[in-house]
A protein has these predicted regions:
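Short, isolated positions within intrinsically disordered regulatory regions of eukaryotic proteins
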Residues: 10-14, 18, 37-39, 51, ...
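Conserved Class I S-adenosyl-L-methionine-dependent methyltransferase catalytic core
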Residues: 46-68, 73-86
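S-adenosylmethionine/decaboxylated-SAM
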Residues: 69-201
């Protein structure tokens, strides 16, 4: 209660206790839909019209050294090289993400912006409650890539509004934050108006 920027988040968490948690169907139905509509990495690259690019080896080696010393309960890397390829090939400059953890996806995006010598990434990450992991958020991002990066340590409700106030449009939005229906609904409806026909969510 001593952190006013988190009040809206706490109020929304309380409201969700009284909402339908699965308005799109049961968890089993939702999972079945996902399996029925999944695709391969190669197909996704084809749909996006991009080739595969790799993050520079020295960045990867540095990130791995940090990853090995980070707490184990912060999640994995995901397909950060797909994000890297997307930004590099499409020459995106206005990038946004919510959910950072150790920062592998952040690294992929920032390494592409560094190659392009253009653009900015605004990341939003709410510190893990009571886990004392704040100092590890973004730990896999080398200091040399920080010049194109703004990290907002806020809940999505505060952070997204602040981030979007800095962009006239958004080229890429990488969403790896609140996985609930209502969390996604809030973020999607806030960000979509800032996206254009060539944007990727």
């Amino acid at each position: 209660m001593q952190r006013p920027s988190f009040w809206a988040y706490m109020v929304e968490e309380l409201r969700r206790k009284f909402k339908d948690r699965t308005p799109l169907g049961s968890p089993v139905e939702i999972k079945d839909w996902c399996y029925a509509n999944e695709s391969t990495r190669e197909n996704v690259f084809g749909w996006l019209g991009i080739g595969s690019r790799s993050v520079e080896k020295n960045f990867i080696e540095w990130a791995l050294s940090r990853n090995d010393t980070a707490p184990p309960n912060m999640g994995g890397a995901g397909d950060f090289e797909m994000l890297h390829s997307l930004v590099a090939e499409k020459k995106y400059s206005q990038c946004l993400e919510s959910g950072v953890s150790k920062g592998w996806s952040t690294l992929g995006i920032l390494a592409a912006l560094d190659q392009l010598n253009n653009g900015r990434l605004i990341s939003i990450d709410m510190p893990y409650p009571k886990l004392h992991l704040e100092d590890w958020v973004g730990c896999c991002v080398p200091a040399g890539l920080h010049k194109r990066w703004d990290l907002l340590r806020l809940p999505d409700r505060n952070g997204l509004k602040r981030a979007l106030s800095n962009y006239c449009s958004v080229d890429l939005y990488h969403y790896d934050s609140d996985k609930t229906y209502w969390g996604r609904w809030y973020a999607f409806n806030l960000v979509f108006p800032k996206m254009h026909k060539n944007s990727v969510f």
